[in-house]
């Protein structure tokens, strides 16, 4: 919902689930009665306990690379012990990037269903956070249980353990939703543009709002992404359009993994290799510009989970010389103006509203 707000779409009005937004990025069209879920490849701890008592230790199977992830999820949905159950549930899988896949279930009622984001429950026993709330939740739980039985000792996971990597020994359904429609960005703001991101959610929101989705082949969505290529792609968008949204996921993923070293590294690269060259290029172009810098939400090192605390933002205008003079940080953000509704930030950027 935070990313939607940044694009000026109030989640209170337009949010129908995260997975349908990601589906839009992949060209997946949802029909009436369809439900879409994110299907993460995850890691359960190696422990000899019933499935409900297992602990989830990675929401991304150790940031599994795409080839192995694709091979595992394809094998799973073709497996004779899994395929009949998936077909009975009306579920098909759409392969995504790295650990992120999408599952679409046809002719299903998900009213009341409760699914938990895996990244908010790392280290926890899964029993209390397995799907619940409606009859279809039982179907998803059985699919998840069956997936573990099939995936745990698959040769790919045996090899991953031997190499010191986390196995992708489970799938996790979450981010449920139905078909979504969002307001047209160019019509509302009078500017067309594009979205540069390695995350399907951002591309999906961009597509549904009438923006161009730009893919950078060397972008990983992690701390080791190709920062220079993403900057080049963003500046390329501005040669054709008036607006670009440049998104980086590295600090968030590092925090989910409790990886302080690479969280700091990502932030330093963001400052030196993204914000600085983008700002310099805009100044060199010789035209007035405005720049909005912010994160979409907090992610805490203490527990690796997302949080709803306000995030600091910078709104820079090349026509204005005076500013706060303070470094960009959470502490200094609290000293500045407070915007209660995140969907108003884009109005501020385009000067439709004032602070």
How does the language model describe each region?
Residues 1-355:
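Feature captures the catalytic ectodomains and active-site-proximal regions of enzymes
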């Amino acid at each position: 919902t935070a990313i939607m707000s940044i694009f000026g779409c109030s989640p209170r009005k337009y949010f129908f689930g995260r997975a349908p937004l990601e589906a839009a990025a992949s060209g997946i069209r949802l029909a009436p009665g369809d439900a879409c879920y994110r299907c993460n490849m995850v890691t359960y701890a190696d422990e000899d306990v019933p499935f409900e008592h297992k602990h989830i230790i990675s929401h991304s199977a150790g940031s599994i690379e795409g080839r192995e992830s694709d091979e595992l999820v394809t094998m799973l949905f073709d497996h004779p012990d899994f395929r009949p159950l998936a077909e009975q549930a009306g579920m098909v899988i759409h392969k995504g990037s790295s650990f992120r896949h999408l599952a679409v279930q046809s002719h299903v009622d998900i009213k009341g269903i409760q699914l938990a984001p895996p990244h908010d429950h790392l280290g926890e026993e899964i029993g209390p956070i397995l799907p619940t709330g409606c009859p279809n939740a039982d179907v998803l739980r059985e699919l998840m249980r069956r997936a573990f039985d099939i995936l745990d000792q698959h040769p790919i996971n045996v090899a991953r353990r031997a190499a010191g990597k986390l196995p992708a020994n489970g799938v996790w359904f979450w981010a449920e939703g139905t078909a979504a429609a969002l307001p047209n960005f160019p019509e509302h703001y009078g500017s067309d543009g594009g979205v540069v991101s390695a995350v399907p959610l951002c591309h999906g929101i961009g597509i549904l709002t009438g923006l161009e989705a730009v893919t950078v082949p060397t972008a990983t969505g992690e701390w080791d992404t190709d920062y220079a290529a993403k900057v080049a792609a963003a500046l390329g968008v501005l040669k054709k359009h008036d607006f670009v949204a440049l998104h980086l996921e590295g600090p968030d993923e590092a925090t989910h993994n409790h990886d302080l070293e690479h969280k700091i590294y990502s932030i330093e690269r963001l400052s030196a290799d993204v914000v600085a060259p983008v700002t310099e290029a805009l100044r060199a172009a010789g035209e007035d510009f405005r720049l909005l810098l912010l994160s979409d939400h907090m992610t805490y090192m203490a527990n690796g989970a997302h949080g709803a605390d306000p995030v600091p933002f910078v709104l820079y205008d090349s026509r204005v010389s005076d500013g706060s003079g303070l470094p960009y940080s959470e502490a200094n953000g609290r000293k500045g103006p407070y915007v209660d509704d995140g969907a108003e930030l884009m109005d501020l950027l385009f000067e439709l509203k004032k602070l």
